[in-house]
From Swiss-Prot:
Residues 1-23 form the signal peptide. Keywords: Cell outer membrane, Membrane, Signal. GO terms for biological process: chaperone-mediated protein folding; protein stabilization. This is Outer membrane protein 26. It is found in: Cell outer membrane. One of its GO terms (cellular component) is cell outer membrane. Belongs to the Skp family.
Length: 197
């Protein structure tokens, strides 16, 4: 009796496995990088982000130039004091020379402290700008990738594909159809992208 149960279970397992293996699977490939690069909304998104961040970037560039100009002016100021001291040194007493050197050192230290503060503020603004820019780019990139995923899913369901794989992650495949262009064509363009065409 045990043998009959084993043979029946084995036969049933083989029948199920062969039936599953013989089911036709349709496999398709897409080049996700190509689709992303040629997405109908990609340029509109890039233009939108550029318009959003260009004024801030220009303001930061102007602020950096202002800081650089202040650094140059501070150096010139200290260098002028040093040059004046060198010129006057032969006529001055040693105590007067030391006093003026201390004044120059104090002036240099005060200028350095002020400039360090300005540079730190500038660096903080730049870091905040970069973080905000990266966040917005990630948000917009996510929207584009979502639309690619939706278009791929819809096309795969409509055409009856069992699997859709990224062609860049496949080492070898015996069969499959490249549906990259079909997916790209099925992505609806936003109104802004259509206006640019």
């Amino acid at each position: 009796m045990k043998n009959i149960a084993k043979v029946t279970a084995l036969a049933l397992g083989i029948a199920l496995a062969s039936g599953y293996a013989s089911a036709e699977e349709k496999i398709a490939f897409i080049n996700a990088g190509y689709i992303f690069q040629h997405h109908p909304d990609r340029q509109a998104v890039a233009d939108k982000l550029d318009a959003e961040f260009k004024p801030v970037a220009e303001k930061l560039a102007a602020s950096k130039k202002e800081v650089d100009d202040k650094i140059a002016a501070a150096r010139k100021k200290v260098e002028a004091k040093v040059a004046a001291l060198e010129k006057d040194a032969p006529r001055l007493r040693q105590a007067d020379i030391q006093k003026r050197q201390q004044e120059i050192n104090k002036l240099g230290a005060a200028e350095d402290a002020e400039l360090q503060k300005l540079m730190q503020e500038q660096d903080k603004k730049v870091q905040e700008f970069q973080a905000q820019n990266e966040k917005r780019q990630a948000e917009e990139r996510g929207k584009l990738l979502d639309s690619i995923q939706t278009a791929t899913n819809n096309l795969a369901k409509a055409k009856g594909y069992t699997y859709v794989l990224d062609a860049n992650s496949i080492v070898f495949a015996v069969e499959g159809k490249d549906i990259t262009e079909e997916v790209l064509k099925s992505i609806p363009a936003s109104e802004k992208a259509q206006e640019k065409k």
